[in-house]
Curated annotation (Swiss-Prot):
Protein name per its UniProtKB record: NADH-quinone oxidoreductase subunit F
Entry keyword annotation includes Iron-sulfur: yes
Positions contributing to [4Fe-4S] cluster binding: C344, C347, C350, C390
InterPro entries the record matches: ComplexI_51kDa_subunit, NADH-UbQ_OxRdtase_51kDa_CS, NADH-UbQ_OxRdtase_suF, Nuo51_FMN-bd, Nuo51_FMN-bd_sf, Nuop51_4Fe4S-bd, Nuop51_4Fe4S-bd_sf, SLBB_dom
Residues that hold FMN according to the record: 166-213
Length: 421
């Protein structure tokens, strides 16, 4: 359990103002120049030592990602912050954007300095109007105080930060589709390689990081890598914002240590499952794109490695709780419709497969399938998984795989007759 003094996001629920004056009282922008004066290599190494892994879902080492950026280049390079939070069940970045904007902006400055980028773009979800307004106000305050812009914080480093609003496409949360959109093109993922660190925004070296990943950097540098590494579990260090929704008594966002048990998280902060723990049916532990877990596996630790071992994933940390009243087949069918709608259509397996899977899922809801079609559906998910340019195909396949793995008997019980055509 996380100690109160170890919390990074002390205004996560908007108890206080998000303006610059209040943010400074909470420790933001405290002696930022001294951190910049320590040099780029220090910042990158400190973030590496902290064990910070990307909070957007992939869980890749943030410091390692920064180290991939080429050094001593004459052409521009960029930092891009992915604030296009669109994953069903996930709203952690939204609260950072609303209530802790200066943590993000200070993190942008430090990360930009670390990778040698004089320009940073915050790409925010189009529907986040109020959040975008808060970020823009915070940027205006930071420019006015000389914290960013020319000679940021008096360090001699120039850092300009721009806010760019998306247009509501889920696919633009994929890093290369985001870059395409930022360039004014249709948001469609790029083939990799080349990777963004070599050929990113406008053909220049680019690092793309999640909002939460960037927002924790200033606190890590102030308190030290060993402090952050001492929270959580080995290889799964630090704090994480979890979003708890669904059939709980008190849906909430909460910052906790990595590795806390899923059951403890729900019972301590969300008031427990509606009707008690025995009324639990299943939980999606990391946003809609990861496989669900049945009640028997729901005391797992909430970290990258433990959830992977359990057959799911930490993803974004969006916890969706489903009690016994849930039509689990329809719940997953609804997610299938989402991924069908959000597919960009570039890759044939995803373009054709997501629609096919949704149609079969809707027949499963009504029980109008043959038992053999369950295996056929599972085979199609495996043909889509790993055969697309980006991970949206995987995201569409995994919820269905989790459903069949853990609730096959419920699917079979609903099938009306094997003679259905």
């Amino acid at each position: 359990m996380l100690k109160e003094e170890d919390k990074i996001f002390t205004n996560l629920h908007g108890q206080q103002s998000h303006d610059l004056k209040s943010s400074k009282k909470r420790g933001d922008w405290e002696n930022t120049k001294a951190l910049l004066d320590k040099g780029r290599d220090f910042i990158v190494e400190e973030v590496k030592k902290s064990g910070l892994r990307g909070r957007g879902g992939a869980g890749f080492s943030t410091g390692m990602k920064w180290s991939f950026m080429p050094k001593n280049l004459e052409k521009s390079c960029y930092l891009v912050v992915n604030a296009d939070e669109s994953e069903p069940g996930t709203c952690k970045d939204r609260d950072i954007l609303r209530f802790e904007p200066h943590k993000l902006i200070e993190g942008c400055l430090l990360a930009s300095f670390a990778i040698g980028a004089n320009n940073c773009y915050i790409y925010i979800r189009g529907e986040f109007y109020n959040e975008a307004s808060n970020i823009q106000r915070a940027l205006d305050e930071a420019y006015k105080e000389g914290l960013i812009g020319k000679n940021s914080c008096g360090s001699g480093f120039d850092c300009n930060i721009y806010l760019h609003r998306g247009a509501g496409a889920y696919i633009c949360g994929e890093e290369t589709a985001l870059l395409e959109s930022l360039e004014g093109k249709k948001g469609m993922p790029r083939l990799k390689p080349p990777f963004p660190a070599g050929f990113g925004l406008y053909g220049c070296p680019t690092t793309i990081n999640n909002v939460e990943s960037i927002a924790v950097v200033p606190t890590i540098l102030r308190r030290g890598a060993s402090w952050f590494a001492g929270i959580g579990k080995p290889n799964n260090t630090g704090t994480k914002i979890f979003c708890i929704s669904g059939h709980v008594n008190k849906p909430c966002n909460v910052e906790e240590a990595m590795g806390i048990s899923l059951k403890e998280l729900i019972e301590k902060y969300a008031g427990g499952v509606r009707g008690g723990w025995d009324n639990l049916k299943a939980i999606i532990p990391g946003g809609s794109s990861v496989p669900l877990l049945p009640k028997s596996l729901c005391e797992v630790d909430m970290d990258f490695d433990s959830l992977r071992t359990a057959g799911s994933g930490l993803g974004t940390g969006g916890i969706i709780v489903m009690d016994q009243s849930t039509d689990i087949i329809y719940a997953i069918a609804r997610l299938s419709k989402f991924y069908m709608h959000e597919s960009c259509g570039q890759c044939t397996p995803c373009r054709e497969g997501t629609g096919w899977m949704w149609r079969v899922m809707m027949r499963l809801v009504k029980g109008n399938v043959k038992k053999s079609e369950i295996d056929e559906l599972l085979n199609v998910t495996k043909e889509i998984e790993g055969h697309t340019i980006c991970a949206l195909g995987d995201a569409a396949a995994w919820p269905i795989q989790g459903l069949i793995r853990h609730f096959r008997s419920e699917i079979e019980a609903r099938i009306k007759s094997d003679s259905v055509v």
